Every structure is written in structure tokens, then in C-alpha cells.
Amino acid sequence: MDEQTFIMIKPDGVQRGLIGEIISRFEKKGFYLKGLKLVTVDRPFAEKHYADLSAKPFFSGLVDYIISGPVVAMIWEGKNVVTTGRKIIGATNPAQSEPGTIRGDFAIDIGRNVIHGSDAVESANKEIALWFPEGPANCQSSQHSWIYE
């Protein structure tokens, strides 16, 4: 099985109409969408998702931001999707993101940086289990043999 990652388009990305653009970038790279849902997150769920950041001074503002509007939660699958997905997304601080990355092209402030992506396989597995307790879709891309050796 290929690696999986969790990607979330944050409320600013949803409100700005960037869903299609973001999905397109992952699809064009050759990754396969295995789960997708548009959800409005409540405070306890957001706090659980960001529990590892609970001691940070920005935690409360981050939770307020995530619950401020709908988000798009996704599971993406492919070879090295966690590492490559982070490269597609760009640095957490948009000012340090290269042009051509999602944050480099669409974000200005670190507090409104459009997208979240798992930072490691372990956190991806944890986030996927939290957001998709039903698991990913049981399907395989027909393009798989055209992308991978």
C-alpha cells in the first residue's frame, strides 16, 4: 500500500474558493484522493486535532480560526505523499514559502495560511483516524501503473 497523508483546506482557503486549485495540484502530481469531506468543526474537535500545540501561545487563536468556517478534510495516497505533500504546500510561514507552493502563491499571514498537511507518517495516521473514523475509500486509481514503476 502507498503512503497516506491528511490534508485540510482551512476556512480561509474554502472561503477564497481555492478548493479546486488545491485538489488539482495534488492530482496533477499523481496523488490519489482517498477521502474528502466538507465539515464545520466544533471547538472540542479542533482542540483534539491541535492537541500537540495546546501549550503554544497561539493555540486559542488557531482553534478560533479553524472553527470560524467550513474546512475540507482529505486523505491523499501515493509514494512519499507526506514529504512531497509538504513541499507542495510550502513553509508554515507564507513569507518563507517559495513561489509555486500553495502557501507561496495564496497566503500572506502565518495565521491564515490556507492549508494543513501532516508532518510525518505517524501524525498522518493519527489525523486520518481522527477525521475519517470510517477509513479511506476502498478503491485504486486506474492511473497507478502510469505513474509508478
From Swiss-Prot:
Q: Which reaction does it catalyse?
A: a 2'-deoxyribonucleoside 5'-diphosphate + ATP = a 2'-deoxyribonucleoside 5'-triphosphate + ADP; a ribonucleoside 5'-diphosphate + ATP = a ribonucleoside 5'-triphosphate + ADP
Keyword Nucleotide-binding attributed:
yes
Supply the EC number(s).
2.7.4.6
What top-tier enzyme class does this entry carry?
A: transferase
A molecular function (GO) term: nucleoside diphosphate kinase activity
The cofactors required by this protein are:
Mg(2+)
Q: Where does ATP bind?
A: 10, 58, 86, 92, 103, 113
Keyword Transferase among UniProt keywords: yes
Which keywords does UniProt give here?
ATP-binding, Kinase, Magnesium, Metal-binding, Nucleotide metabolism, Nucleotide-binding, Phosphoprotein, Transferase
Membrane-crossing segments per the record:
none
Kindly give the SUPFAM superfamilies that the UniProt entry links to this protein. Nucleoside diphosphate kinase, NDK
- BP GO annotations: CTP biosynthetic process; GTP biosynthetic process; UTP biosynthetic process
Q: State what this protein does.
A: Major role in the synthesis of nucleoside triphosphates other than ATP. The ATP gamma phosphate is transferred to the NDP beta phosphate via a ping-pong mechanism, using a phosphorylated active-site intermediate.
Return the similarity comment.
Belongs to the NDK family.
Q: What is this protein called?
A: Nucleoside diphosphate kinase 1
Classification from the root reads:
Eukaryota, Viridiplantae, Streptophyta, Embryophyta, Tracheophyta
